């Protein structure tokens, strides 16, 4: 192998906040540096903060690392991989979806493991034997074989569950535009404590006696855009002191499913105060559990958060993590979760980024929500650099069940 053809994988130290100890991830691509040279791993003095399910903060001096191998980047040499320390090997672009397929192209070479990838490139893991690379250390592409589509909206139109505007028989659209935890016009259905927006729709009245004439939903070139922007002065007396208008869509009354894959393709807004999300809640209206397929803060659009919330042990816990990603405000990306009876896995642009065990209380049908919150303690309030409207552009939302493992699902709920 010619020295110039060898690519070595280099990582920069990064301090990350994650939601559960031992689930440390960041998105750090490999870089071509020409001729072979010694790889510098993350130093022992690079501290990392992690959160346990109980909320305690711990300092770790050896953060787990992800070694990313992408198609088209040539041969690679990786040093310092340690699965026992929760390091991961992420393989993108080679259509490798199962650990067995990766193990089939591994061979031991002395004290190293050589991975012969489809099309010719090889990856050498130095001082790592194949038996030291467990299935759990591999982050692969989403396996779409055996997936049966159970829900699809490409937003060529907007199917609104229009409560308050039509007789019951005409209200059977797909997307409900409030939480439904109070009456459709109640504050508890139109925002969450600490947030600064109201989730509006053309029927929304607030405390006024008639509709306020608001519509945060816009169809643009086959996408649904949810706009978050300052509330007009004329409606401020009627929206419980909130300062912004935005949108929420849910399948609470149209679709829920036990287990499966839930996916969205979207471009996210940039600017302090914006907080877009795609998530799942139980159809029986209990909480937790909850699966956050993604959450992003508008002032940190290169960081992606995922989490699974539970109260199975009596206390509210959250397991998941955050990771570095390309700027999510610049282009559309795919965000997905595969939720099964044993495990939950998150995917970004079709490649696994995180997994946790399925909590004991997460075995009942859940429905989908997508919303653009504005303001609050976590995203902060919009500032002088925030540009309005903030636009959460959704290309599609889809759901699948996996056969034959998943039980019958995709159940419908009456209005």
Language model regions located:
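N-terminal Sec-pathway targeting helices
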Residues: 2-15
């Amino acid at each position: 192998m010619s020295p110039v053809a060898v690519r070595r994988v280099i990582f920069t130290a990064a301090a990350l906040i994650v939601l559960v100890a031992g689930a440390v991830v960041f998105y750090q691509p490999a870089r071509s540096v020409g001729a072979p040279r010694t790889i510098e791993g993350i130093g022992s003095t690079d501290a990392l903060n992690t959160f346990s399910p109980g909320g305690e903060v711990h300092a770790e001096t050896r953060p787990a690392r992800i070694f990313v191998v992408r198609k088209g980047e040539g041969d690679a040499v990786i040093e310092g991989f340690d699965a026992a320390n929760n390091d991961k090997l992420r393989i993108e672009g080679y259509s490798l979806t199962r650990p067995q397929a990766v193990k089939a192209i591994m061979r031991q070479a002395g004290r190293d493991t050589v991975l012969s990838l489809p099309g010719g490139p090889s990856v050498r893991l130095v001082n790592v034997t194949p038996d030291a690379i467990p299935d759990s250390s591999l982050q692969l592409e989403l396996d779409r074989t055996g997936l049966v589509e159970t829900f699809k909206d490409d937003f060529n139109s907007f199917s609104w569950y229009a409560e308050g505007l039509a007789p019951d028989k005409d209200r059977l659209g797909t997307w409900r535009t409030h939480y439904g935890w109070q009456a459709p016009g109640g504050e508890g259905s139109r925002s969450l404590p600490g947030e600064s927006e109201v989730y509006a729709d053309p029927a929304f009245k607030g405390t006024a006696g008639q509709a306020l004439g608001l519509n945060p939903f816009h169809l643009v070139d086959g996408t649904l855009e949810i706009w978050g922007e300052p509330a007009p002065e004329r409606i401020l007396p009627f929206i419980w002191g909130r300062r912004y208008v935005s949108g929420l869509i849910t399948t609470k009354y149209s679709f829920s499913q036990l287990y499966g894959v839930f996916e969205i393709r979207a471009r996210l807004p940039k600017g302090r105060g914006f907080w877009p999300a795609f998530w799942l809640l139980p159809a029986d209206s209990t909480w937790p559990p909850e699966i956050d397929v993604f959450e992003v803060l508008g002032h940190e659009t290169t960081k992606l958060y995922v989490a699974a919330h539970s109260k199975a042990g009596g206390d509210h816990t959250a397991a998941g993590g955050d990771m570095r990603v390309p700027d999510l405000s610049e282009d559309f990306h795919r965000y997905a979760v595969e939720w099964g009876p044993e495990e939950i896995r998150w995917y970004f642009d079709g490649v696994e980024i995180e997994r946790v065990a399925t909590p004991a209380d997460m075995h009942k049908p859940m429905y989908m929500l997508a919303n653009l919150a504005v303001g609050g303690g976590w995203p902060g309030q919009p500032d002088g650099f925030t540009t309005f409207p903030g636009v959460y552009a959704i290309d599609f939302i889809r759901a699948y069940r996996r056969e034959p493992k998943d039980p019958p699902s995709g159940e419908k709920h009456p209005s």
